[in-house]
Amino acid sequence: MIDQNVTKSEDNKFKILQAAKWYSPEVGGIETVAVAITDAVRDKAEMKILVCSGNKGKETGYTDEGVYIYRAKTPFRICSTPISFDYLGAFRKMSKDVDLIQLHAPFPLSDLALFLGRRSRKIKKALWYHSDVIKQRKLMFFYRPLLKWMLRKVDKIYVASRSIAEQSKYLGKHMDKVEVIPFGISTREYDKAERFPILTEALNDKNNVKILFVGRLVYYKGIDVLIEAMAKTSGAELFVIGGGELDESLKKRTDELGITDKIHFMGRIEKEELLAAFSDCDFFVLPSVNRAECFGLVQLEAMVYGKPVINTSLPTAVPEVSVHGETGLTVEPSNIDELAEAMNLLISDEELRKSYGINARKRCEDSFSMSKMQEKLYASYLELLGKK
């Protein structure tokens, strides 16, 4: 049941409803952005959050920071999209008397909720556009009209890089609404996290270099390419953190290649263990294979610990985050041999890893500051609401 008190607010604070698919402790780039948005306005505005119930089993209630989250009952999914009548009803109730609705795309359920809600034009609507829908082409037949309607109705569209807007099939007519706000990362949060040798302790050969992958085990992440490339490397072990639909097939392929001693499937782990893994690895690999990977925020989580990154030359912001020859290496998507060559180079050259790692940390501090991201977003909100 929705807490009726969440509609009350201090007179000097504007009120925001953030509607997303998932929220922390669910792990992912979009979830990280949703938390960053909350943190940007938490002390200056009243934020309430509507999401679907996720895999972590968290209940509706308040966060430690006092932010109200309603986790709608989600009985099933179609094409990875949650279906929830509870979400639609909660959106209508929670959007009452707010000043601003913050949405995320692509997410058909929240778009439908906005369409059915038909709230006053006085309520400003902002959208964080993460990427086009890439895989579920059949879904787009039904979703496209709703997405186009929603893009017309929102007052502001945020993207993490100009390339996301320029490569999109749907944002071209709405560039006047687009504002670029690069994702940020809080170096302070990562610096104060406990560090322990979570990967080192699991090594089969203590002399091996530790390679890390973190992400959902889904098609566009390119984890299958990474597994194949690992068969062409020596002197290293790969740690795979995350779960997803490809879990069993990846383990089977690892067994077929005879490299089970080189690959550790760790599944989903707690946040403190995840941060320890980033700090303990020697380098990070993001082998994504198509535009569904629009930014690769996870790269920053490795870079903040001074770790070099191998990424792919996608026509998105991915290679703009970690720069080839400066903070790591960039290879062609789906190119097993090129990926293996890049990994072998970093495996064999400790000094190169150190040099890239130093540059990676500096790039985080200079170009991807969480405080700068949040300041820019809050200023945009004030302008949108006519308070600036």
Task: Report the location of each language-model feature.
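Acidic donor-binding loop of glycosyltransferase active sites
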Residues: 279-294, 307
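A short, active-site helix/loop in glycosyltransferases that binds the activated sugar's phosphate group
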Residues: 152-190
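Nucleotide-activated donor-binding/catalytic signature segment of Leloir-type glycosyltransferases, i.e.
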Residues: 251-269
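Short hydrophobic beta-strand element within catalytic cores of glycosyltransferases
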Residues: 308-312, 322
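Conserved acidic donor-binding segment of nucleotide-sugar-dependent glycosyltransferases
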Residues: 323-325, 329-336, 343-351
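Short alpha-helical donor nucleotide-sugar binding micro-motif in glycosyltransferases
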Residues: 268-269, 276-281
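An aromatic- and histidine-rich active-site surface loop
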Residues: 57, 86, 100-122, 127-129, ...
